[in-house]
């Protein structure tokens, strides 16, 4: 159990370090970023399908954004500051397709993270996931936007 906690601490550190790096010269940070790591291979998880939903007034989940992780396991540019308003969001990772592409039969169909965003004013969110075929762990880094 202690090694698992240490691993989660290392994952949080990795997210912090990736968040500290610049996305591009002069580019503003995106308000929502996803980072996915493969715990089996010890590497970024590339080409993981990501869907983001926003909870509507009628309690249904409406599609908000989508994409695939890059070779670095990251997905930037999902939304803009103007569109990423206060609300309940769900990030869904297509873990089944990822593991199947590697010839592995996974337990989970997908991994999801549901969170409230921007309820205390504008924030930037990095959602990080650590995947294995039979488990997943998530963490988040929430920071104030930089001017």
From Swiss-Prot:
The record lists L-thyroxine as bound by 35, 74, 137
The signal sequence is: 1-20
- Residues with Sulfocysteine modification: 30
Its predominant location is secreted
GO MF terms here are: hormone activity; identical protein binding; molecular sequestering activity
One cellular component (GO) term of this entry: extracellular space
- What InterPro entries does the record point to? Thyroxine_BS (IPR023418), Transthyretin/HIU_hydrolase (IPR000895), Transthyretin/HIU_hydrolase_d (IPR023416), Transthyretin/HIU_hydrolase_sf (IPR036817), Transthyretin_CS (IPR023419)
Question: Record's PROSITE patterns?
Answer: TRANSTHYRETIN_1 (PS00768), TRANSTHYRETIN_2 (PS00769)
Glycosylated residues: list them: 118
Compartment(s)? Secreted
Q: Known SUPFAM superfamilies for this protein?
A: Transthyretin (synonym: prealbumin)
Does Phosphoprotein show up as a keyword for this record?
A: yes
Cite the post-translational modification comment. Answer: Sulfonation of the reactive cysteine Cys-30 enhances the stability of the native conformation of TTR, avoiding misassembly of the protein leading to amyloid formation.
Q: Which residues carry this modification: Phosphoserine?
A: 72
Which positions carry 4-carboxyglutamate? Answer: 62
Q: Name the UniProt key words of this record, in alphabetical order.
A: Gamma-carboxyglutamic acid, Glycoprotein, Hormone, Phosphoprotein, Secreted, Signal, Sulfation, Thyroid hormone, Transport
Q: SMART domains from the entry?
A: TR_THY (SM00095)
The UniProt family comment states: Belongs to the transthyretin family.
Q: Describe the subunit structure.
A: Homotetramer. Dimer of dimers. In the homotetramer, subunits assemble around a central channel that can accommodate two ligand molecules. Interacts with RBP4.
Protein function = Thyroid hormone-binding protein. Probably transports thyroxine from the bloodstream to the brain.
The protein's name: Transthyretin
């Amino acid at each position: 159990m202690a090694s698992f906690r240490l691993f989660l601490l290392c994952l949080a550190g990795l997210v912090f370090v990736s968040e500290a790096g610049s996305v591009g010269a002069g580019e503003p940070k995106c308000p929502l970023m996803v980072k996915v790591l493969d715990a089996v291979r010890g590497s970024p998880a590339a080409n993981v399908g990501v869907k983001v939903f926003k909870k509507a007034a009628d309690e249904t989940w409406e599609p908000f954004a989508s994409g695939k992780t890059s070779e670095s396991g990251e997905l930037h540019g999902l939304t803009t500051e103007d569109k990423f308003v206060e609300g309940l969001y769900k990030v869904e990772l297509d873990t089944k397709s990822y593991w199947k592409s590697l010839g592995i039969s996974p337990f989970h169909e997908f991994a999801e993270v549901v969170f409230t965003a921007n309820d205390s004013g504008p924030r930037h969110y990095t959602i990080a996931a650590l995947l294995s075929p039979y488990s997943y762990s998530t963490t988040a880094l929430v920071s104030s936007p930089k001017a």
